[in-house]
Amino acid sequence: MRRGDPAPRWPGAVLPRAFFDRVATDVAPQLLNKILAAADGRAGRIVEVEAYAGAIDPAAHTYRGKTPRNATMFGPPGHLYVYFTYGMHWCCNCVCGPDGTGTGVLIRALEPLQGLERMRAARPPQTRDRDLCRGPARLTQAMGIGGAQDGVDLIGAHEGFAIVDDGSAPPADLAGGPRIGIRVGTDLPWRWSVPGNRYVSGPVTRR
């Protein structure tokens, strides 16, 4: 899905650009319980996220500056930054902060809400519903997100994806824990999840 596609439909308000035009570590926990919705009807509640803080974060793709691969992350806030990793998986981030800062939030897990048949068809046979979107690579596969979605405007009316506030508040009194799947920056407590949610990829060790 790209420009010209129908707008995603989900009850609630599409998050405005101002929501994303802030420090990634502020945006990330407030994305919990928001809805990632696709124009084809697939939708899931965001239950796990990680923040990446650009030039001050050795684990960020943008730590060493702008390249053709990470250029989207340096663009305006409120867009998807989709990248290929380990030669086999796509991961998706929301670009945050002012244009040029190279910061964003990795969406790590969704609780599937709608369009489960499409999600199941996109994932390997026999995948349990709990595992459809439990992890960053799984959720992109289930939601139909790949390289073609890099740069999609989440606020644009017809770019295929949006993040929607359906009135569900983020969990209260959240504490961050260390990010996972990285080798540097592991001391930074920039991973958050919905406590007790069975769709989270792994428990957050609070610090």
From Swiss-Prot:
User: Sorted alphabetically, which keywords does the UniProt record give?
Assistant: DNA damage, DNA repair, Hydrolase
EC numbers for this chain = 3.2.2.-
A Gene Ontology molecular function term for this protein is: alkylbase DNA N-glycosylase activity
Coiled coil spans: none
Q: Which InterPro entries match?
A: Formyl_transferase-like_C_sf, MPG, MPG_sf
One of the Pfam families matching this protein, by short name: Pur_DNA_glyco
Q: What class of enzyme is it?
A: hydrolase
Q: Which domain of life is it from?
A: Bacteria
Q: Which GO terms describe its biological process?
A: base-excision repair
Sorted alphabetically, which HAMAP family does this protein's record hold? 3MGH (MF_00527)
Q: Which family does it belong to?
A: Belongs to the DNA glycosylase MPG family.
Q: What is this protein called?
A: Putative 3-methyladenine DNA glycosylase
Record organism: Burkholderia lata (strain ATCC 17760 / DSM 23089 / LMG 22485 / NCIMB 9086 / R18194 / 383)
Lineage, uppermost ranks: Bacteria, Pseudomonadati, Pseudomonadota, Betaproteobacteria, Burkholderiales
